[in-house]
Each structure stands twice: as C-alpha cells, then as structure tokens.
C-alpha cells in the first residue's frame, strides 16, 4: 500500500467519511552549493521521490484535526479562533501548528481541516523531512481554500514557521525545492532573489544518497560559527553578503584577512562559482565535468570550510574509486556527518552499492544506509 492509499484508508476509518484531496511534498538533496544559501548565493538541489503525503478535507467549522500515522496515529486538535501555541510533548505537531499560525498572518481566508499525515523521508538524514512536512501542510490549506499563494510563498511560510515557531534556524532552500521541484530536473536557486531555473538532469543518471549514520554532534554550534565567520568576511569587504565579493577581489587582499576567515570566504566564493558552472555542465549532460566540480566542492568543504569528518571522507573515497570520472560524489548538507550525494550512471549503481557495503563498515565500524532516488515533482495533488 503506498502513502496515498494508506492515508486515504486511515482517513475514512478514523473520520468516517472520505478525504477530498491528497497532497504530497517531497524531501530534497543538494547536488552542489553548500553553506552558500545564507551568503545570498546559489544552490543546486533536486526534489527526491521520498515525500510527506496528507489526505485531507475541509471542515465547516474552525477546527483543525490531525492524525500522525507514523506516530501511532497520535491525534492533534486545535482551533483557528484561539491563539496557536507550541505543543509541549508532540514535536511533530508544532510543524503543523507553526505553518497554520504563519498562514493566518499571510491570508486568514480559510477554515478548519481534517488531515491524516504519513511520510517516508528519512528523518535526521539531512533530506529535509521537516521542510517537506511544512510545505505539504501549507499546500493543503492553499488547495482546499484556493488561497492566492504561490510555491515560493508557501516555502517562505514554512521557513518562518521553522525559524520562529519551532525555533530551528534554516535557510530557504529546503522549503523552496520541496515546493517548486520539477520531475527529472534540478533547480538552480538564487538565494537572494529566490529565482529558480530548472536544469534538466542527464538521462540514465541516478541520484544516490548514502547516509554515513555518523551521529552529528557539532552541527549547531559549528554552523553558527561558520555563519559568523562569513559575516565577518562580508564586513571586511564592506558588502551586504559574500555573494557580492568576487574571487579576484578576494585574492588581491586575502593575506590581510584572519587566516581562518580567509579559508571560509574562499570556500563560499569558489562554491558559488562551481554551482553556477555545475548547472551548465548538467544541462549539457557533461557528467565528467560535473564530477570534477563535485570533487572540488568536497575538497573545499574538507580543507577550507572544515565541515567534513573522517567517516564522510571515507565514503567519498570509496565511491570515487568505484566510479572514476563517470560521475561525481561529495558530502551534502550542513556537515559533521550526515550524507554524501553521488551522481552516477544507473548501470554503476550495483558496483557502488557493493563497494560501499564491503568497505565502509570495515573501515569505520558503522553501517551505511543507501538510497537511490529520482529527481521528482514539487508539492501538489497526488
């Protein structure tokens, strides 16, 4: 039974009437463009075929009722006429509450909803299960009540809910790609303007995500330190963001910067350039050049931004040794663990899976998780 069938069946069973709509919103993986989003730079993610699915129907009152199928059918209920506050024990429900609260501030022309939620985006793997949930909930209200909100506004609403209501800092990329993703394409997103350009993916290429399953510990504090270092760099150049600094301008005065800040700045500037070039390489179907850019990106994250760990570097080395120049591999996500992403010809997937299975656990003592994904459509009815 797929997620649509599961949520529709559960909806009818619990609410004793049929759902009118089923909405999905996907998770995502970032192919290249790491730690560039909060520097007003470029990212190149694609939506993946793991998603949050919600079967739903409008109510004729002001109550929102939610069933979380993945949490033992926990029930959540709140009124649109009372102040929406955080739930003490059900963390999942705060994503729903936050999205609805921020939607009210944008456009209050909606009533109550019954919904059943289920998803298969792996949690804690850096594949944006939370953004997928936020965008799915926003799309439910937009579709049921014909709200005049586009995908970018639904994405911004989700980001606000996560930052201000749930209390977790994030850029806009995760929600934007979940809302705007296009089947068989990646999106080159300009994080300053939120402009997005669809980039076609070469035929016969698989998006492979391998979770190192190394438990991330430093990610919060180190993330904030990296942001501060980037802001220090932008101030040195008297620019609003590192997006506005050229590599030439940086190279001319790099020796005057604090050495650590200089390394952080160099990563962001070079990563922005790589990301724009990667979009053009993908569009041309030049997997070899894409692989070189992904290798440079990983080296920059390892040596200049210093956010990889030995387990991640080991995974990258195993994959690279298997595929040679027929594709690329790099760490993806915030760093200090998490996943690597590889773009490889579909016929090489079994060899990569086997090499990783034979070598990674032997070298690190940790068993990986292996996902083969397809670039998928963004949020909407399913």
UniProtKB/Swiss-Prot annotation:
GO BP, sorted A to Z: galactose metabolic process
Matches recorded under PROSITE patterns: GALACTOKINASE, GHMP_KINASES_ATP
EC supergroup of this enzyme: transferase
Gene Ontology cellular component terms for the protein in this record: cytosol
Keyword tRNA processing: no
Chief location bin: cytoplasm
Listed InterPro entries: Galactokinase, Galactokinase_bac, Galactokinase_CS, GalKase_N, GHMP_kinase_C_dom, GHMP_kinase_C_sf, GHMP_kinase_N_dom, GHMP_knse_ATP-bd_CS
UniProt-annotated catalytic positions: 174
UniProt-listed Enzyme Commission number(s): 2.7.1.6
Pathway assignment: Carbohydrate metabolism; galactose metabolism
Keyword Chloroplast among record annotations: no
Binding site for Mg(2+): 130, 162
GO MF terms held by the record: ATP binding; galactokinase activity; magnesium ion binding
Binding site for substrate: 34-37, 223
Residues the UniProt record annotates as site (Transition state stabilizer): 28
Listed Gene3D superfamilies: 3.30.230.10, GHMP kinase, C-terminal domain
Domain of life: Bacteria
UniProt-annotated binding residues for ATP: 124-130
Localization, UniProt: Cytoplasm
UniProt keyword terms in alphabetical order: ATP-binding, Carbohydrate metabolism, Cytoplasm, Galactose metabolism, Kinase, Magnesium, Metal-binding, Nucleotide-binding, Transferase
Chemical reaction(s) catalysed: alpha-D-galactose + ATP = alpha-D-galactose 1-phosphate + ADP + H(+)
UniProt record similarity statement: Belongs to the GHMP kinase family. GalK subfamily.
Main function: Catalyzes the transfer of the gamma-phosphate of ATP to D-galactose to form alpha-D-galactose-1-phosphate (Gal-1-P).
PANTHER family reported in the protein's UniProt record: GALACTOKINASE-RELATED (PTHR10457:SF7), MEVALONATE KINASE/GALACTOKINASE (PTHR10457)
Protein name stated in the entry: Galactokinase
Organism: Salmonella choleraesuis (strain SC-B67)
